[in-house]
């Protein structure tokens, strides 16, 4: 080896140093791939930043010193970056002008604790050649799904069943704001009667616009695109089983940047730890909503 190094004008120290570095890089890459694949076994479509948060301590324990940029470079080279998907979304909001509409009670409030505001929405689930409809109730602060129901129709019975489930997670005597879009299911007499009987308050978007119920829409997207609920299920029971498992994993395993990389379950158990990051996120979202409203108002005025 000395003769070869002399022939090419290299020292053996430089040669072995370079070889050691190459081997170290290969070992580090192998560790990263192994740790990422372990996470993806449970959260197959989790994005890179959240995956890095989940594996960085384990990598440190493995002796791998790596920053986020290098981590993303390895994911890219190994074909492990997640490509965001979009799917066709059938309309699930049906507005009935004959039904009463609640005021938007959440527009200007700061949500800083669990059981303060729930956001509700309905999203489609493909079952065979038909659609089923998933009603969800999510806590606005800690982002956990606390109520859900899969129905074969868009009747109000779906949101009512989801709300009944959600109510079981709320301490007795707590007056929660139940926020939703203006869909006829949420404006129905039966749904509003249940909200009142539970001691909750009804709130609705002022406009039929997704920005005014963005938190609920976001959860829909996460469950579909990160937990594969956008696929076509063979049977209704298969869909229900997949939804139950997806919600359990979402609540207990998926970190949220808006919660300081805590899971929804962790945020509910330790709201004080999640609050600083959550409040900054709420303020940022509020400003974005105000800018969006101003643009829409300007567009209407120009028209």
What are these regions (language model features)?
Residues 2-22, 44, 242-261:
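K/E-rich alpha-helical interaction surfaces of small helical-bundle regulatory domains
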Residues 4-8, 15, 36, 51, ...:
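Mobile genetic element proteins and their domesticated derivatives, centered on retroelements
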Residues 9-114, 209, 265-277, 285:
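Basic, flexible linker segments flanking DNA-binding modules
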Residues 17, 144-148, 202-205, 229-230:
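Short small-residue beta-strand/loop micro-motif enriched in glycine and branched aliphatics
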Residues 68-136, 158-162, 169-175, 289-303:
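Mobile-element integrase/transposase regions
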Residues 94, 180-182, 188-195, 202-224, ...:
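RNase H-like two-metal-ion nuclease catalytic core shared by retroviral integrases
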Residues 139-140, 150-155:
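A short acidic/small-residue loop/turn micro-motif
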Residues 196-198, 222-303:
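C-terminal domain-tail junction helix/linker
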């Amino acid at each position: 080896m000395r003769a070869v190094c002399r022939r090419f004008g290299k020292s053996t120290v430089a040669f072995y140093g370079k070889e050691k570095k190459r081997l170290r890089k290969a070992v580090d890459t192998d560790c990263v791939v192994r740790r990422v694949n372990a996470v993806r076994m449970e959260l197959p479509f989790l994005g890179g930043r959240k995956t890095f948060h989940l594996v960085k301590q384990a990598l440190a324990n493995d002796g791998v010193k790596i920053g986020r940029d290098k981590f993303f470079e390895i994911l890219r080279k190994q074909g492990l970056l997640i490509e965001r998907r979009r799917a066709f979304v059938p309309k699930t909001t049906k507005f009935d002008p004959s039904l009463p509409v609640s005021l938007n009670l959440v527009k200007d409030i700061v949500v800083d604790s669990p059981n303060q505001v729930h956001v509700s929405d309905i999203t489609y689930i493909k079952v065979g050649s038909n659609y089923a409809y998933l009603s969800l109730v999510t806590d606005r602060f800690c982002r956990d799904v606390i109520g859900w129901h899969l129905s074969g129709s868009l009747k109000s019975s779906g949101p009512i069943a989801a709300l009944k489930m959600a109510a079981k997670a709320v301490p007795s005597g707590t007056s929660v704001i139940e926020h939703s879009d203006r869909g006829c299911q949420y404006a129905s007499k039966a749904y509003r009667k249940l909200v009142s009987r539970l001691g909750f308050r009804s709130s609705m978007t002022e406009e039929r616009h997704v920005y005014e119920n963005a938190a609920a829409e976001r959860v829909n997207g996460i469950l579909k695109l990160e937990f594969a609920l956008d696929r076509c299920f063979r049977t209704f029971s298969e869909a229900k089983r997949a939804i139950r498992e997806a919600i359990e994993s979402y609540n207990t395993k998926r970190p949220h940047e808006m919660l300081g990389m805590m899971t929804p379950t962790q945020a509910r158990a330790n709201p004080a730890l999640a609050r600083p990051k959550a409040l900054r996120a709420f303020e940022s979202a509020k400003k974005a909503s105000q800018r969006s409203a101003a643009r829409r108002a300007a567009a209407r005025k120009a028209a």
